[in-house]
Amino acid sequence: MKFNKWTVALAATGVVSLASAVQADESHPVNTALSSTTLSGYVDTSAIWNLGSGHTVANRFANTGSDRQDGFNVNTIKLQLEKPIDEGTWSAGYKVETMFGPDANVMPGALTSGVAIKQGYAALRAPIGNGIDFKIGQFDPIVGYEVTDSYANPNFSRSLGFNNLEPFGHTGILASYQVNDIIGVSAGVANGDSNFGLNGGSLTASGFASGQSGSSMRGMLAESSKVYMGSVVVKAPESAGWLSGSSLYVGAVNGDAKGSKNDPTLLYVGVSLATPIKELSLGASADLLFNGGGTGALGGSYANAYAFYTGYQITEKLKANNRFEYATSGYGAFLPGRTQDKIIGETFTLDYALWSNVLTRGEFRWDRSVDGGANPFDGQKNDLSLTASIVYKF
């Protein structure tokens, strides 16, 4: 074996032995696996000022809940380990995402107060056709314009559809296949106790005691109680000119989210549209949920949420994002204390890249009840807030 001059010099002084150098040079399976593993994550912080006299807000994600108003917040600290799968081979990998902080408490993978496994799955590739990719374990939902990680969204606050209608995650198996450069498909099956937006914040309405987690109720569900999902995505090719990169996404999720009394079906449609103005991007999403066939408190109920997105890159470092929403339901999905509700929402966000690896944003959000019922926001029809968000990514 050939040693470099520094190794020989260290061996001469007794700092290392040539035997240990030989051993260190040998390939070990553990070292080989770790060499392709990446560590990443972020720290998500915010400060929110509610412009009203109270703290009652619309049912959005935890990072803008009533307990985050008028103060400083550490929302999430996330650590991620991942070994991606290789192209074109019988390849294997994995992903583990762990969340720490108050946002973790609402996730389906919550282990204890302030800790959750957001994702934890084995990734497998079968080189059949263009390659079939499998995720086995806990994985993110296949529907939704927005995601749990705030920095990856156009706005800091989440849409009404994200929090109230869409799943936060599934535990099961998901298969994905890229038919060609334009069309991709996926299909999966998961446990029936996975978090589902319809009942995610309303366990009592689904017939179970408040405070019970989905996993604790698995023994109460039928063996056939599963969630089924599928999606199709169509992307415009480079030959489409200025439309290149645009996409149309259609997905559906059906399953017994929290027991046999409810049978929700969610249809999701999302569009991301490039424009002839390269600085301008457009998007839209629709979440349509119907709890057909159920006999419980939510049997036959519906909920719909629509969102329209506009993004404009003002300068190299400054970007503006706007989201307008309209949502309605037959069971009070979006507003506190409602049996039926209608709400409009307007969110405007400025993103300025001041520091490397740091996302710095300021956001104005306005929610207004338009169903004609009692004023839901501490006696007011409107809820307005200002948010400063800083996220460090590594």
Where do the language-model regions lie?
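C-terminal beta-signal and adjacent terminal beta-strands/loops
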Residues: 356-360, 364-379
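Detector for outer-membrane/organellar transmembrane beta-barrel domains
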Residues: 230-344
